[in-house]
Amino acid sequence: MVKFIDAKIDNFAKQLQQRNNLDRIEYLKMRLGMQVVVNNFFKTIVIYGVSLLCHMFLYTLTVHLTFFFIRHFAHGAHAKNSLLCYIQSVIYFVLLPWIVGYVQVSSLIMYTLALVGLIIISIYAPSATKKQPIPERLRRGKKIKAICLTLIFLLISLFLNEPYQQLMLLGIVIISILQFPIFFPKEDY
């Protein structure tokens, strides 16, 4: 199935290359972009499919949106391969929300962890990788935006009821953990 999809992407990219008179580098960039979109599409189906089966859709969505918006500016560690990404995503966005939502983790614990997360984001964000470097001229702006978004989510969470309050805070905790340099190979930082 994966080879079939990859072959279709390759054929489509070649057609676009010929039609638009693109060089090899532009073709490879376009092909990679299509692969990322397709991979993210399938990952989304898996994560939200599992969350629907577990009756956790809104829990998953709350954590994922908080995580996604902060990650846009904070960046952070990525899984080493696609399989690990699927596994980590199910853990982050289905298992952990289940634990926080159904085991009823206290607000005090979650706010403490989220405030520690804010400090971590303030220190380490944005976290660049070898595959996704961040130009020096963008670093300061991304750091400020990541901190501001984290503060906004902390404020919004004050007005939410349990478990959504804790789930929003969980998104902050997850993205902050992915900022630590220990999750990057030596050549990445």
UniProtKB/Swiss-Prot annotation:
Organism: Staphylococcus saprophyticus subsp. saprophyticus (strain ATCC 15305 / DSM 20229 / NCIMB 8711 / NCTC 7292 / S-41)
Protein name: Accessory gene regulator protein B
InterPro entries, alphabetized: AgrB
GO cellular component: plasma membrane
GO molecular function, one term: peptidase activity
Function: Essential for the production of a quorum sensing system signal molecule, the autoinducing peptide (AIP). This quorum sensing system is responsible for the regulation of the expression of virulence factor genes. Involved in the proteolytic processing of AgrD, the precursor of AIP.
Entry similarity comment: Belongs to the AgrB family.
Pfam family, one: AgrB
